[in-house]
Amino acid sequence: NFKSRINKTTALSDKNHRFVPFFGSSEWLRFDALHPAVLAEKYDRNYRPYFIGQRGAASLNQYLGMQQMLPELKNGTAVYVLSPQWFTKKGYNSAAFQQFYNNDQLSSFLSQNQTDANSQYAAQRILEMKPEITMKSQLSKVANGQDLNSLDKTYIQFMAELNKREDALFSPFAASNNANYDKKVLPYLKELPDKFSYEALDQVAVRDAEAHTKSNDFGIDDRFYKKRLAKKIGKLKGFQKNL
């Protein structure tokens, strides 16, 4: 579950399995032979990817989600994939941000008691995305570079404990996608060479791309192109020229 603290911290602190967080967006939902989960399984790597990302989740959501698991991330390994659609003139969509936001992320962020430039900018962006937000007074202080007083810190600590308990209560009810392993990982294992080599994987990638991009000259997957673009491709000419 993208918003759950306990799911993420439990996985990343597992002593019996080494999970490496892979931060991103909808990329992780698109499986093929070169998906990180498939590669890790095929070549029995000493870790397994722990995918943290959903369609529409962008950098601010990921930043806040990281606040929930800073001890687990410290001195560790992580992979972060940037999506081109994040970089727009108007910035992130407020509705999309709120879909992946919860109060535990905010109390985790404020509990760090940071007033540096990064925290200040993050606080400003959060207020832009959700103007009427819990702990707005404390968040506004961080956004303005002001120190939090003892009363602020006590309130934040209280809210942090409350949010942690709420997360622990509801997280077990989050839907599990473990059943997708047989459906989304195993079928692709046979497409990979038994012996790992970048040259061989390049050949797999080229062969797969050629087989699935025959309907257009843009290198776009045939199913996506036919369903989403084919009928309106003419209208898109010059669409992003002035961005």
Segments from the language model and where they lie:
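Membrane-embedded segments
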Residues: 28-118
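Secreted/periplasmic serine-hydrolase-like ester/acetyl group-modifying domain
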Residues: 110-243
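Residue-level detector of functional hotspots within protein domains
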Residues: 6, 12, 35, 64, ...
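Catalytic nucleophile-elbow at a beta strand-turn-alpha helix junction centered on a G-D-S/GDSL motif
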Residues: 17-33
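N-terminal post-signal-peptidase region of extra-cytosolic proteins
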Residues: 2-7, 57-66, 239-241
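Short loop/turn segments at strand-loop or loop-helix junctions that form parts
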Residues: 24-25, 80-85, 223-227
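Short low-complexity stretches enriched in small and charged residues
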Residues: 4-8, 31-38, 212-224
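Membrane-anchoring hydrophobic segments
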Residues: 1-17, 22, 40-44, 72
